[in-house]
Amino acid sequence: MAVCIAVIAKENYPLYIRSTPTENKLKFHYMVHTSLDVVDEKISAMGKALVDQRELYLGLLYPTEDYKMFRKLHNSYTDVMCNPFYNPGDRIQSRAFDNMVTSMMIQVC
């Protein structure tokens, strides 16, 4: 069940965060930012010392049965990136992307 979907920029900040309407909305935003900190720690550790490459593996980031959901999200994200009026690195404000994410969250919940 997807309760929060986030798109993260290459520079490690969120471009888009959407969560289901719950009383714990702030909790999901906090979890996204905390996850970014973990990724950042792994990346910075790689540059400081000789680190075992297996330690950098973050694990499977989505359940295998939800690959269709991931593919749909990726295709919609690609559409946003291909928009000539979108500046890479800006927050995603596309209504089509937002509607697609909302429909995914409704289907899953």
Curated annotation (Swiss-Prot):
Domain of life: Eukaryota
CDD domains: TRAPPC2L
Alphabetical GO biological process terms: endoplasmic reticulum to Golgi vesicle-mediated transport
Cross-referenced InterPro entries: Longin-like_dom_sf (IPR011012), Sedlin (IPR006722), TRAPPC2L (IPR044760)
GO cellular component: endoplasmic reticulum; Golgi apparatus; perinuclear region of cytoplasm
Signal sequence extent: none
The keyword Calcium is annotated on this UniProt entry: no
Localisation per UniProt entry: Cytoplasm, Perinuclear region; Endoplasmic reticulum; Golgi apparatus
Key words, A-Z: Cytoplasm, Endoplasmic reticulum, ER-Golgi transport, Golgi apparatus, Transport
Family listed: Belongs to the TRAPP small subunits family. Sedlin subfamily.
Subunit details: Component of the multisubunit TRAPP (transport protein particle) complex, which includes at least TRAPPC2, TRAPPC2L, TRAPPC3, TRAPPC3L, TRAPPC4, TRAPPC5, TRAPPC8, TRAPPC9, TRAPPC10, TRAPPC11 and TRAPPC12. Interacts with the heterodimer TRAPPC3-TRAPPC6A.
Function recorded in the entry: May play a role in vesicular transport from endoplasmic reticulum to Golgi.
Protein name per UniProt: Trafficking protein particle complex subunit 2-like protein
Organism: Pongo abelii (Sumatran orangutan)
Encoding gene per record: TRAPPC2L
